[in-house]
């Protein structure tokens, strides 16, 4: 039996993508079992594989882990991407929460009701430009290192890179005023494991399209 982690999710970004990113950055190969129908999801539930009847779920080290943050915490700890002490870990957690907040805001736009789309898009752009990106630009300036925390790669660097790439897809002009973040994006993107994950043919998922959204609605009933 393969010793690789096995990821159970829909064949799209969603809440699994940050997990894919972190595993790839750690140089960990993984397999994926895609949920392609309501029956696939129901079988996982009936077999007792989903603690809260939800995905993402990752099989790793004999466990079936649910909840995105719990999975990320385990991977980061296992592969030494969680800082060198409690203070670094606290900073990593704080920065990560902000990153995930903005990531969620941007990703939710694709399933936003049409009558709310304009207002929510404007809010996401405002939060990106005036709250979140300035905060991380300030961190990079004050810390003065190649990384957000300490002087080596941690999970939060990968989470921030993923976010910056989403921002670039969303509206590339939002990055214009943040030279340190642009340099950070280039720097982290050039790391060997990350560079490999960014290449065509990797397990990185493309932006979701209308067909995928419709398929996901049928499976997950949202």
Curated annotation (Swiss-Prot):
Its main location: cytoplasm. It is found in: Cytoplasm. The modification N6-succinyllysine is found at residue 4. It catalyses: RX + glutathione = an S-substituted glutathione + a halide anion + H(+); prostaglandin A2 + glutathione = prostaglandin A2-S-(R)-glutathione; prostaglandin J2 + glutathione = prostaglandin J2-S-(R)-glutathione; (13S)-hydroperoxy-(9Z,11E)-octadecadienoate + 2 glutathione = (13S)-hydroxy-(9Z,11E)-octadecadienoate + glutathione disulfide + H2O. Pfam families: GST_C, GST_N. Residues 3-83 form the GST N-terminal domain. SUPFAM superfamilies: GST C-terminal domain-like, Thioredoxin-like. Glutathione binds at residues 9, 45, 54-55, 67-68. GO terms for cellular component: cytosol. GO terms for biological process: epithelial cell differentiation; glutathione derivative biosynthetic process; glutathione metabolic process; linoleic acid metabolic process; prostaglandin metabolic process; response to nutrient levels; response to xenobiotic stimulus; xenobiotic catabolic process. In addition to its enzymatic activity, the homodimer of Ya chains, called ligandin, binds various organic anions, xenobiotics, and azocarcinogen dyes. Belongs to the GST superfamily. Alpha family. Homodimer. Homodimer or heterodimer of GSTA1 and GSTA2. This is Glutathione S-transferase alpha-1.
